[in-house]
Each structure stands twice: as C-alpha cells, then as structure tokens.
Amino acid sequence: MKPIYGLIGNPVAHSMSPDIHNAALKDLSLEGHYHAFRVENEDLEDAVKGMRALGIQGFNVTVPHKVSIMKHLDRIDESAEALGAVNTVRREKEGLVGYNTDGAGFLKSLKPSLDRPLSELSILLIGAGGAARAIFTTLAAETPKRLDVANRTPEKALAFTQRFDGEARALSLQEAEADLSAYDIVIQTTSVGMHPNVEAAPLSLANAKETCLVCDIIYNPLKTALLHEAEAKGLKTLDGVGMFIGQAALAFELWTGHEPNMEKMKSIVLQQLGGKSC
C-alpha cells in the first residue's frame, strides 16, 4: 500500500497542507498521498486509533489538538516536550512519536523582517494555545528584551510567562490593547480571523507605535483583519505563509527523509490565495 500522510484538526477545509505535501511528493517522485481529516475534540482519541489502524506514516496536527494529542502518542520528542505541544507525528518502531516544527518554522520566517536582534526588542504574543507555546519557547531562547503574553484568560498566559527568566507579563487582551505602544513586535497566534470568520480580530491596533511589526500566523486569508488594520496604519506586517511553509518542510523531511523545494511550496500557496505574501 502506498504511504498515507495527513492532517487532523478542526477546521481543516481551508488547509493547503494537502496541496503542498502532495505536490512535494510528486516533485520528488515519491509514492504516497496526504489527506486532511476534520476531527472534533471528543473524537480525537478515536481518530488516533484510526491512524494506527490505517498504518498512516505521519500526520500534522493543527488547532485545537496540538496539546491534547500528546497523551495519545507513544513518545514525545524532547523538543516538543519542552514546547508543550505537538504539530507533527511520525510512525516509528516504537509507535507514534510527536514532534514540533512550529517554533523553528516561525523563527525562520521572522528573522528576515528584523532590523535589530531579538535581544533588543519587546514582544507581545497573543494567544496561549499549542502554536503559541512553541513560538514562546523558541523566542524565549533568543532572550528578547521583553516577552509578554495576552490571552482571553490571563491565567493560561501566566503559565507561559512563569517559564521565562527575563521580563514577562501575562495580560488580558484589554490590558495588552491599552499598552500596545510598548511593543516592537506583535504576534497573533490564535485562530481569530481564520477563514471563514475573516472579519474578526483579537484586538485593536489603535495604540501600536509606528515602527511595530505585526505578525499573524494565519495564512488563509493571506491578509487577516488584523494585518489589514496594520497596513492601514502604515505598520510593517508578516503573514503566516513563511511559518506555514517552514514547519511543513520540516515535517515532510521527518516523514520521508527528503527535503522539499520550499519555493515551489510557497508558490502553490500564493497561487491558491491569489496574492503576494506580506
């Protein structure tokens, strides 16, 4: 049987993971097929059992399962354990093993947009889910000047900031919005603004300073409501395409042992979205 790869999450109808992974398999003349599976929270355990039964070689994990998937796996890679979330699963001799390529993928996309080292910058991270965990831990290793986390429930954000040795605060979204002028970088990691709820934004950028870089890890739509507001204010922006491609390429290599052509992956995404990346 040809190898099967996949994606589990909810929603997944918008995902371009099947497009880029299937194109990469074809480009490298590798057998296999990648398919997206919509999985509700209450069905996650059964879905993982199904992955085992079907002999699926590897799969990506997206919202809302990046944290809850961990208890259903046979082993968690050390880096994913430290990040507290899994976005990639590979079938190995010992069973299903969880990895995380989110943090490395995001950092790879962020650095070309910076004119100073992260150690000189104050950062606001919006959200406290699986992707936020990965990005927070990766950024913390870069020792930024300040690394605050804002979330609808500040208690969840507090669990992040307590792990950082430097200056960090856990904030409500309202508190972050009021103090937005303190940040050089704002990073939006939640599903707010994702297709089909494209008019939504987690907070207003009214108080952001002129030099602020606004990042949104969502890539569909290419420009979220938050990024549209940032552009209208003349702020620099970074969409989620770079992170999406970066983490996908790392996952693909984990499964197949082959490095995909990232430029081809990016061109597929931009063609599907009908625009140019920020």
UniProtKB/Swiss-Prot annotation:
Shikimate binds at residues 15-17, 62, 87, 102, 219. GO terms for biological process: amino acid biosynthetic process; aromatic amino acid family biosynthetic process; chorismate biosynthetic process; shikimate metabolic process. It comes from the Bacteria. It catalyses: shikimate + NADP(+) = 3-dehydroshikimate + NADPH + H(+). InterPro entries: Aminoacid_DH-like_N_sf, NAD(P)-bd_dom_sf, SDH_C, Shikimate_DH, Shikimate_DH-bd_N, Shikimate_DH_fam, Shikm_DH/Glu-tRNA_Rdtase. NADP(+) binds at residues 78, 127-131, 151-156, 217, 240. The keyword RNA-binding does not apply. Keywords: Amino-acid biosynthesis, Aromatic amino acid biosynthesis, NADP, Oxidoreductase. Signal peptide: none annotated. Pathway: Metabolic intermediate biosynthesis; chorismate biosynthesis; chorismate from D-erythrose 4-phosphate and phosphoenolpyruvate: step 4/7. Its EC number is 1.1.1.25. The active site is at 66 (proton acceptor). One of its GO terms (molecular function) is shikimate 3-dehydrogenase (NADP+) activity. One of its GO terms (cellular component) is cytosol. The keyword Amino-acid biosynthesis applies. Involved in the biosynthesis of the chorismate, which leads to the biosynthesis of aromatic amino acids. Catalyzes the reversible NADPH linked reduction of 3-dehydroshikimate (DHSA) to yield shikimate (SA). Belongs to the shikimate dehydrogenase family. Homodimer. HAMAP family: Shikimate_DH_AroE. This is Shikimate dehydrogenase (NADP(+)).
